[in-house]
Amino acid sequence: HWALGRKEANIWEKSPGQVVSDADLAVDRFLRGELEKLVPAAGWLSEETHIDHSGAGDELTWVVDPIDGTKDYVAGKTGWCVSVALVQNEAPVFGVLVAPAMNETWVGRAGRSATVNGRALVATQRRQYEGCRIPAESLPPDMKLVAVPKPNSIALRMAMVADDRADVVASTRWGHEWDIAAAHVIAAQAGASVTNALGETLVYNGTHGKALGVLCCSPNLYDEAVQRIGKYVSENGASH
């Protein structure tokens, strides 16, 4: 029922700053029913039903965010998507992002090329940090970086790196793996570097579902990005 510019009526906060709508719950129910039929052996971990950890630690698990970027969804903006990943042995092996408001479908599969609307993705290979593109509403001029449009969905921001629309996406928030699992496999298969904010391997389908931020960037900027983020975290700490 989403429409550009129309605000969603049935929304509430499940925790401070964490918005949920009727649509989140409806999509969650629909996806769980369909995906469990598709791979009956797989466990289930999603944003809306993460209290159920019956699947945590299973070899195969669906890791799902029914609407990533809910704030944009409920505000009638386009920067949201449905994020579905299949995780095997703690790594995402298949991921899909469906962004209906942008008419884009992103698909990634381990060992295969990633695509958007069927077109092969080639991630940014930028080498120079100064002047690199960062999804942001605004950036201080002294940073010498270029702000590009920022969807509320972290998954779509990572997808921008996968399609050479942005060069670095970083978050130092304690986030959740359902936000990034699908985008991780898409960006990695497109040639981007993807780790947690401190440059450590992201491990999926742990029982807590949490991850210390994410870094998704040109492989040629990765070392410098890790240094910059590490310095920031040591000075400011990680945010929640």
Regions found by a protein language model. Give the residues of each.
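N-terminal subdomain of lithium-sensitive/metallo-dependent phosphomonoesterases centered on the IMPase/IPPase/PAP
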Residues: 1-67, 234-240
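A short, compositionally biased
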Residues: 6, 80, 108-112, 188-189, ...
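Short loop/edge segments at beta-strand edges and connector loops
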Residues: 46-48, 118, 198
